[in-house]
């Protein structure tokens, strides 16, 4: 019997009569910006070659696949949680909320939702129907729809960091993407933090004396 580690969308579709949405997140670790998630329902009649965990792909390849996913997927949706929501809920619960928003925003209700990682929130479709979901450890490298979601989320967040970099070039967001690097620590020590920072994260709390 197949296990989740070896299941593909084709395997899963043989067990169900409906469509599958893959879900993944990007941006749990950075000190600044939204945590970004994506939900993708791929079209089984329009396969996309080269899908993989977004972290294992070059930026150029991610960008190309992003465009192909947007063109060929049956539907996709980005969901997010803001720094204020992260501070209020904590990063785990904010990530679950962002995933729920992504799935609820799909204009097609999937029969099954597959989430990268070791936990899954309760999902409700745009029409209010409850959805079955499963979490799959390292699913972004195993299940095509989760790989696609990881690419959509990663490219979306990277582009947002580029916008933030243009507004605040002294922080170097285009290089470190908001993650807690030495260069980033030096930048916030010199320039302080602004409203897009996650004030509940230890390095930011320490700087603010909270």
From Swiss-Prot:
Belongs to the RNase HII family. Residues 18-210 form the RNase H type-2 domain. Keywords: Cytoplasm, Endonuclease, Hydrolase, Manganese, Metal-binding, Nuclease. A divalent metal cation binds at residues 24-25, 116. Its EC number is 3.1.26.4. It is found in: Cytoplasm. The keyword Nuclease applies. HAMAP family: RNase_HII_B. SUPFAM superfamilies: Ribonuclease H-like (SSF53098). Endonuclease that specifically degrades the RNA of RNA-DNA hybrids. This is Ribonuclease HII. Manganese or magnesium. Binds 1 divalent metal ion per monomer in the absence of substrate. May bind a second metal ion after substrate binding. GO terms for cellular component: cytoplasm; ribonuclease H2 complex. The keyword Metal-binding applies. GO terms for molecular function: manganese ion binding; RNA binding; RNA-DNA hybrid ribonuclease activity. CDD domains: RNase_HII_bacteria_HII_like. It comes from Shewanella baltica (strain OS223). It comes from the Bacteria. Its cofactor is Mn(2+); Mg(2+). It catalyses: Endonucleolytic cleavage to 5'-phosphomonoester. NCBIfam families: PRK00015.1-3, PRK00015.1-4. GO terms for biological process: DNA replication, removal of RNA primer; mismatch repair.
